[in-house]
Amino acid sequence: MRVQIDPSALAAELRASRAHLAKIIAGLDGDKLLGPKLTIVNPPLWEIGHVGWFQEFWCLRNSAPGAPPEPFVRGADALYNSATVPHDTRWDLPLPDLDATRSYL
């Protein structure tokens, strides 16, 4: 079943979620960006980028025929696609720094 969502309402919700995420990550730096390597947790820096990738992938790139097939950030699929990036490798990826990751949002 395909659900129709008003594009303006969706855009507003996505902006609100990014603003909320910005508040959550405001104090992250250094070791807090990667955190401990645990089987039940992703690195925070990876999760932040994954939020941007997820919104881009599902809301822009797969929204309609003719949507752009490639990510806006070169290599983003190889970094943030949780279906293809094994969990235990996410700490070792060449992730962008926090400022670049915030820009991706």
Task: Describe the residue ranges of each PLM region.
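Generic start-of-chain signal for non-secretory N-termini
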Residues: 1-26
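Short, helix-capping/interhelical loops that line the mouth of catalytic, cofactor-
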Residues: 1-9, 58-105
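Membrane-entry segments of alpha-helical transmembrane domains in multi-pass membrane proteins
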Residues: 6-10, 37-48, 98
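Alpha-helical transition-metal enzyme core signature, strongest for iron centers
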Residues: 14-21, 44-58, 80-87, 102-105
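Helix-loop segments that flank and shape redox-cofactor active sites
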Residues: 19-43, 60-69
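Glycine-/proline-rich flexible loop or hinge segments
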Residues: 32-42, 55, 87-94
